[in-house]
Amino acid sequence: MSDTLLNPYFGEFGGMYVPEILVPVLKQLEQAFVEAQNDPTFQAEFADLLKNYAGRPTALTLCRNLTKCTKTKLYLKREDLLHGGAHKTNQVLGQILLAKRMGKTRIIAETGAGQHGVATALACAMLDMPCRVYMGAKDVERQSPNVFRMRLMGAEVIPVEKGSCSLKDACCEAMRDWSANYETTHYLLGTAAGPHPFPTIVREFQKMIGEETKRQILEREGRLPDAVIAAVGGGSNAIGMFTDFIDEPNVRLIGVEPAGKGIESGEHGAPLGHAKVGIYFGMKSPLMQTEDGQVEESYSVSAGLDFPSVGPQHAYLNEIGRADYVSITDEEALNAFQELAKHEGIIPALESSHALAYALKLIKQNPEKEQLLVVNLSGRGDKDIFTVDKILNGGTN
């Protein structure tokens, strides 16, 4: 891969493991991205869309009630307030501008929780691009509000009935479509994973989350946080938060994977702590695998975290010890979901609830410890209210 413009690897992780027919397409994308990063006109248009369409910068909110009787200050980076309801809108706008720059006339995407699909649909509507979204049939059912939003904004939503009918299967179908239609189509990948250059592109189009957080916390508290905490599925909201803090050694980076029904049950989506390295989705990264090397089914109550692998930069940060990766069960995430709603009047996405749950766990372990924590509230929970209601009233997800 020595002829790429950017390093395709993070340590041993990453790469471009795709059919030969897609290699020149990925290199074209890399070339366009490098040129766009150095083009003031592109950057100005992207910045304008982020400010005047998406609503950046997002707020940094101090939790007034969750930390009562403790010495912790807990802030939430409010990506739930972004247009579209989650952090996904940031990088979607950047990628569609790139697609237009390359002369592409059609956008495809995959989605799990539906937030990336909604972000893609709204941006395609505004920027006048046709849009097809692949979504696991199981996720179509449990995220029906987002499916309606996507279709309302003109997107074609394709339920994927193969495999586990979840995010990994939607990713595979999107890849197949792209392989057949790459001349006209841009695959708007939704997370900081997949083949190079997607992990780098998505990180660069999400890193304003951490940049804003750093400015805001310094303004509010006069110092950097002790830790920033974010949920990790593929890893885009987390890498967006972490990037500007990587070179701040006194700031702990904590990624929270889904432990599902408990790691010991086998029903989880925590490859960083409990998987072997494999090749999947065009990249080399930790991958949940069966004994004979087949991709294992991941599980989480949160559709957006239900993914058997993880972005390569997270794998690298884990390997070198710069970031810590922990896991939170469905039950713990559901409790955090309710706690934030009840005590702060904010309904978080189930994805974000995993990060919040770990922050609350840290606080409860040592309530007398003076600490400054920031949780990336990556999305709002409107999409999850029916799922949570069903679970709390005796059903199952």
Curated annotation (Swiss-Prot):
Q: Which residues carry this modification: N6-(pyridoxal phosphate)lysine?
A: K88
Gene Ontology MF: a single term: tryptophan synthase activity
Question: Recorded E.C. number(s)?
Answer: 4.2.1.20
How it assembles, according to the record, is: Tetramer of two alpha and two beta chains.
Function (record text): The beta subunit is responsible for the synthesis of L-tryptophan from indole and L-serine.
- PROSITE patterns attached here? TRP_SYNTHASE_BETA
- Tell me what gene encodes this: trpB
GO CC aspect terms: cytoplasm
Organism field: Haemophilus influenzae (strain 86-028NP)
For this protein, the record's Gene3D superfamilies field holds: 3.40.50.1100
Q: Which Pfam families match?
A: PALP (PF00291)
Instruction: Name the coenzymes or cofactors required.
Output: pyridoxal 5'-phosphate
Please give the HAMAP family that the UniProt record associates with this protein.
Trp_synth_beta
Q: What is the lineage of its organism?
A: Bacteria, Pseudomonadati, Pseudomonadota, Gammaproteobacteria, Pasteurellales
The record, for NCBIfam families, names:
trpB
Protein's pathway: Amino-acid biosynthesis; L-tryptophan biosynthesis; L-tryptophan from chorismate: step 5/5
Keyword annotations from UniProtKB, A to Z: Amino-acid biosynthesis, Aromatic amino acid biosynthesis, Lyase, Pyridoxal phosphate, Tryptophan biosynthesis
Please list the reactions this protein catalyses: (1S,2R)-1-C-(indol-3-yl)glycerol 3-phosphate + L-serine = D-glyceraldehyde 3-phosphate + L-tryptophan + H2O
Family per similarity comment: Belongs to the TrpB family.
- Descriptive protein name: Tryptophan synthase beta chain
- Entries under SUPFAM superfamilies matching the protein: Tryptophan synthase beta subunit-like PLP-dependent enzymes
